[in-house]
């Protein structure tokens, strides 16, 4: 419950989702959220976020859970499971993944050195957190031999003509 509230109190657009195979856990979390919201400073923001973007979801199979997680592509994913290691190779879309019950999102925000600039709103499907690579200037170097252009050129001409870029095609 605290982890969901911790995400929800960021702003009213924060996405806060719990997925569990245990229906009784979902009920306990729902009740605990109600209790904890009475005690936090940013309760109005957290309430709005949970109301519009909060979901407590019961899914009975690990396979379906993984499918849903990869579709959601969360900014933060907490695998609060004993068998979290079996999930790791199957999760393809998440900004960061907290492993086990002690690796909570608040630790990633403030203390453990992971990146706090993460892809939001499902953009973890095609993007990663900001890294030092974003601050490197890179140059691509291309060198072709006569044999290389003769081999690759026809496909470039076809694509250029298809796109209506005659100058591109003629340059080959």
Predicted feature locations:
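ALDH superfamily catalytic-core signature
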Residues: 1-64
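A short alpha-helix capping/helix-coil boundary motif
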Residues: 46, 66, 110-112
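A short acidic, often aromatic-flanked loop/helix-cap motif at beta-alpha or helix-coil junctions
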Residues: 63-66, 105
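C-terminal core of ALDH-fold dehydrogenases
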Residues: 70-172
């Amino acid at each position: 419950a605290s982890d969901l509230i911790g995400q929800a109190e960021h702003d009213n657009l924060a996405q806060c989702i719990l997925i569990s195979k245990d229906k009784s856990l979902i009920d306990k979390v729902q009740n605990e959220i109600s209790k904890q919201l009475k005690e936090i400073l940013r309760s109005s923001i957290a309430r709005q976020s949970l109301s519009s973007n909060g979901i407590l979801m019961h899914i009975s199979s690990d396979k379906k859970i993984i499918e849903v997680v990869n579709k959601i592509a969360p900014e933060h994913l907490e695998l609060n499971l004993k068998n979290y290691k079996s999930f790791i190779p199957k999760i393809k879309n998440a900004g960061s993944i907290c492993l086990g019950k002690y690796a909570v999102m608040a630790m990633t925000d403030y203390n453990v050195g992971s990146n706090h600039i993460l892809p939001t709103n499902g953009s973890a499907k095609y993007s990663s957190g900001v890294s030092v690579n974003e601050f490197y200037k890179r140059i691509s170097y291309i060198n072709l031999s006569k044999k290389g252009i003769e081999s690759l050129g026809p496909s470039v001409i076809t694509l250029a003509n298809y796109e209506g870029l005659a100058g591109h095609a003629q340059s080959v």
